[in-house]
């Protein structure tokens, strides 16, 4: 089947040479029957692992009842999921989309709509961080502070500024009377698992309050328990005005969401819409995921396992000089290696039955299912140890 790729599929992905056909828990199997421990999890998507019984049952039951209906009509699953998100976050109103990029596009539109209503169109610029990633549709692409993703797609959307992450002075300097919002990831995922400092996040909130700007938090990768808290902002003692979600919310089923404080949720009928966003099947999946993730002890378990994993990586760091730095929160972990390119490590790990990926060339990213066990973490660490021992640096 892989031989048909170039004939039928656009050449948009650097794929690894395996065909995945089955998944269960933290493992997947290829077409040759080989099993892999999955520490990619669909890039932080399979929050409950593969084919979790509660998720499968929710999707199956809903598929037998009502798969899709237009947003011209109410559906109870959409209302229920919105309620769960609102009551477990900061009490905002929710708009459903189908992906993180869509959610971020909507957040950008919402910020500009809010500023237009309040300031008559004088404020429209949005500040984002260098090295950030917010998606590949035009607004989200322009918000992304990485030139490599911009090449060949100009002219981009006007009205974006980029400042270095954690540089509070640069942030103050970037604010002028045309800025309407600051958009941030508390941990840059595609950018290399770089964390915003508590001081920086609090400074963003302070600057937004002082200048009547909207604080947009991209929680597409950090949200739904990935960092050991239900939402990443909970680590910092601040609350955003707008938050975007996707990835882990559906546990593998496509869904995205914008959450906005009630006074910032200024969209009116016709301002924004989605054909598929908030369909009953996607929302049933989201409800099943949130039911599991919000169970007593679940998030504490994610935090505990994340610390256990980082401690294991720090032990490897002492043994292997190529390991430069360990960073991240919960089960969103980065391991920077002293190489120009970490792809050989990724490929060797795959050969030994461990799926990982690299970002920013030399950072190994680990985002396993949140249900991973300490025994499976030990297994992954052993494979990494073997790989690092075999490769000549």
From Swiss-Prot:
Transmembrane segments: none
PROSITE patterns noted in UniProt: AA_TRANSFER_CLASS_3
Pfam families: Aminotran_3
Catalytic activity entry: N(2)-acetyl-L-ornithine + 2-oxoglutarate = N-acetyl-L-glutamate 5-semialdehyde + L-glutamate
Pathway noted in the entry: Amino-acid biosynthesis; L-arginine biosynthesis; N(2)-acetyl-L-ornithine from L-glutamate: step 4/4
Chief localization: cytoplasm
Residues where N6-(pyridoxal phosphate)lysine is found: 247
Record key words, sorted: Amino-acid biosynthesis, Aminotransferase, Arginine biosynthesis, Cytoplasm, Pyridoxal phosphate, Transferase
Family matches, as SUPFAM superfamilies: PLP-dependent transferases (SSF53383)
Positions bound to N(2)-acetyl-L-ornithine: 136, 274
Subcellular location as annotated: Cytoplasm
The UniProt record lists the keyword Cytoplasm: yes
Enzyme Commission code(s) on record: 2.6.1.11
Group of enzyme by EC: transferase
Annotated CDD domains: OAT_like
Coiled coil: none
GO cellular component terms given for this protein: cytoplasm
Cofactor: pyridoxal 5'-phosphate
Residues binding pyridoxal 5'-phosphate, per UniProt: 100-101, 133, 218-221, 275
Family: Belongs to the class-III pyridoxal-phosphate-dependent aminotransferase family. ArgD subfamily.
Subunit description: Homodimer.
Miscellaneous comment: May also have succinyldiaminopimelate aminotransferase activity, thus carrying out the corresponding step in lysine biosynthesis.
Protein name: Acetylornithine aminotransferase
Protein species of origin: Caldanaerobacter subterraneus subsp. tengcongensis (strain DSM 15242 / JCM 11007 / NBRC 100824 / MB4) (Thermoanaerobacter tengcongensis)
């Amino acid at each position: 089947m892989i031989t048909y790729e170039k004939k039928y599929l656009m050449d948009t992905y650097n794929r690894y040479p395996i065909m995945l056909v089955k998944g269960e828990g933290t493992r997947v199997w290829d077409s040759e029957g080989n099993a892999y421990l999955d520490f990619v999890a669909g890039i932080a998507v399979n929050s409950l692992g593969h084919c979790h019984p509660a998720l499968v049952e929710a999707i199956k039951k809903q598929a037998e009842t009502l798969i899709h209906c237009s947003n011209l009509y109410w559906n109870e699953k959409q209302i229920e999921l919105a309620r769960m998100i609102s009551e477990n976050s900061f009490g905002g109103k929710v708009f459903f989309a189908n992906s993180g990029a869509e959610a971020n596009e909507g957040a950008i539109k919402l910020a500009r709509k809010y500023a237009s209503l309040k300031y008559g169109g004088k404020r429209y610029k949005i500040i984002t961080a260098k090295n950030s990633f917010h998606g590949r549709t035009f607004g989200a692409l322009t918000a992304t502070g990485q030139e490599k993703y911009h090449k060949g797609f100009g002219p981009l959307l006007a009205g974006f500024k980029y400042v270095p992450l954690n540089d509070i002075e640069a942030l103050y300097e970037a604010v002028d009377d045309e800025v309407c919002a600051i958009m941030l990831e508390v941990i840059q995922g595609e950018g290399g698992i770089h964390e915003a400092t508590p001081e920086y996040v609090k400074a963003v909130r302070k600057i937004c309050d002082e200048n009547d700007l909207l604080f947009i938090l991209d929680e597409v990768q950090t949200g739904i328990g990935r960092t050991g808290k239900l939402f990443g902002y909970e680590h910092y003692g601040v609350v955003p005005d707008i938050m975007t979600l996707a990835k882990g919310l559906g546990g593998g089923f496509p869904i995205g969401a914008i959450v906005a404080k009630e006074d910032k949720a200024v969209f009116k009928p016709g301002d924004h819409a989605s054909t598929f966003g908030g369909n009953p099947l996607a929302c049933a999946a989201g409800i099943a995921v949130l039911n599991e993730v919000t169970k007593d002890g679940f998030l504490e378990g994610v935090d505990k396992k994340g610390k256990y994993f980082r401690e294991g990586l720090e032990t490897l760091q002492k043994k292997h000089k190529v390991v430069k730095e360990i960073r991240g929160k919960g089960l969103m972990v980065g391991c920077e290696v002293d190489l120009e390119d970490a792809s050989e490590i990724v490929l060797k790990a795959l050969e030994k039955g461990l799926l990982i990926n690299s970002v920013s060339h030399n950072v190994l990213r680990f985002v396993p299912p949140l249900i991973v066990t300490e025994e499976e973490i030990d297994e992954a660490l052993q494979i990494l140890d073997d790989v690092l021992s075999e490769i000549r640096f």
